[in-house]
């Protein structure tokens, strides 16, 4: 169930008969959810917790996540911190350069809705006004466990997607 395959009986066929029967959608979603390559967009103190997520205690590599330096190589953007009006066009430009399918994780109160600086004239009140957000991770700053839970929620969301139109 956690790997994206919904039929437990199909997994028993692998051990007894040596083959697996699955839908192509399930296989594609399983591969996509197991190889997320995030692009960091660390803007403030939430980026420190994002660094904790990469360290040995949480080890994001075991979930197939490897930070990529270029938006053209990544399919997940983690927006962490206060997004200002001046930085918003850069965020949109980086998002537009990402490969399809692309996902966005909004990390922290500032990225989710402006946070502590919500009433400031120069702060965007949520990065979802600039880019579509798939997962919101609450907290100020959110812990590495919260980001891990957000990544697991994104993997579940990817596993529920339909890639092909059935007629």
UniProtKB/Swiss-Prot annotation:
GO terms for molecular function: 4 iron, 4 sulfur cluster binding; iron ion binding; NADH dehydrogenase (ubiquinone) activity; NADH:ubiquinone reductase (non-electrogenic) activity; quinone binding. GO terms for biological process: aerobic respiration; electron transport coupled proton transport. Gene3D superfamilies: 3.40.50.12280. [4Fe-4S] cluster binds at residues 45-46, 110, 140. It is found in: Cell inner membrane. The lineage of its organism: Bacteria, Pseudomonadati, Pseudomonadota, Alphaproteobacteria, Rickettsiales. It comes from Neorickettsia sennetsu (strain ATCC VR-367 / Miyayama) (Ehrlichia sennetsu). This is NADH-quinone oxidoreductase subunit B. Belongs to the complex I 20 kDa subunit family. Keywords: 4Fe-4S, Cell inner membrane, Cell membrane, Iron, Iron-sulfur, Membrane, Metal-binding, NAD, Quinone, Translocase, Transport, Ubiquinone. Its main location: membrane. GO terms for cellular component: plasma membrane; respiratory chain complex I. Its EC number is 7.1.1.-.
């Amino acid at each position: 169930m956690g790997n994206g395959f919904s039929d437990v009986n199909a997994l028993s066929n692998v051990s007894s008969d040596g083959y697996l029967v699955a839908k192509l959608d399930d296989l594609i979603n399983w591969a996509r959810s197991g190889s997320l390559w995030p692009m960091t967009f660390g803007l403030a103190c939430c980026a420190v917790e994002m660094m904790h997520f990469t360290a040995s205690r949480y080890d994001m590599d075991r979930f197939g996540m490897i930070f990529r330096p270029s938006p053209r190589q990544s399919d997940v953007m983690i927006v962490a911190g206060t997004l200002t009006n001046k930085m918003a066009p850069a965020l949109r430009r980086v998002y537009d350069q990402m490969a399809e399918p692309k996902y966005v994780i909004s990390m922290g109160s500032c990225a989710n809705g402006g946070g502590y600086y919500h009433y400031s004239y120069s702060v965007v009140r949520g990065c979802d006004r600039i880019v579509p957000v798939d997962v919101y991770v609450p907290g100020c700053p959110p812990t590495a466990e919260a980001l891990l839970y957000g990544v697991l929620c994104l993997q579940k969301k990817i596993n529920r997607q339909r890639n092909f139109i059935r007629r």
